[in-house]
Amino acid sequence: MNLGSWSGRQSGLRVVMMGGIFLAVGAGLRCVGAQEAEVGPMPLTPLQVVKAMIANEDDDPAHMDRYEFLSNERSERTGEHMWTERVVETAQGRIRFLLAVDGRPLSAEQEQKERGRLAAIVADPNGFVARESAQKDDEAQARKMLNLLPQAFIFDNVRLENGVWKMDFHPNPKSSQHGIEERVLFAMSGSVAIDAKQERILHIEGRLPSDVSIGFGLLATVRAGSHFSSDRADKGGHWRTVHVLTAMQGKAILFKSVSRESDITRSEFHYLDEGMTIAQAVALVEAGGPARTAGDETARNR
């Protein structure tokens, strides 16, 4: 176990682990709605649906799409302030331009500093790529953990309500996990909601029903009630995460109190062409306004 991941990298309980893993679940649960629309009564068990989802997820090209969007985030990264940022996605990582803090636009001095930071990225793109690689490592770990879902959870209570499939999940007592991320994530219970027509996830939430402890609680404990939720929406034929909420409370390393919370809302999505360079992304994010390249969320529907 790497204790540094608990105290240094968003407590080791990364948003990508809590929200991202289940967003991947939602991206792959297409088979539920498709089967229902064609044959009526659900022909698959919940476990079969989850396994089919995992098999289909790698075939979905949507995760390669790039966007420009507006982000409002309060997290450890923002010093618990609400940051409003314009974000442009590239294959190498996300370029961010800070627009406001706690609802207040940047001063001229702050804006100059922000533009200087972006200029440094253009001057040293390799440094930017190196810094962004940690996030990509997290995503790779999330993909590995995704494959453990059929063993880690019991999925049940599948029902159709007003055109939305709903499914509950809770820990599988026969499963075993290693490391605090797996132990916390796979100790959660919750539910997912899936648009039956579009065959995409709309909402997912999970909550710890009891404490999760490492080293009899002396090394780390995540408290009962810690939770996450995530919402997705169809943006012109492209399904995107529009809200992620994470709230983790606990202690680590001999009773040190730990509290990690994040609240991220994304809007104003605009589809981008493939192959945008880091320099082009910086120019776009500094220019402001929507990106009207080959198409946007209203004009392009693949």
PLM feature segments, named:
Residues V16-A27:
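Bacterial N-terminal signal peptides
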Residues L13, M17, A134-Q135:
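Intrinsic structural disorder/low-complexity segments
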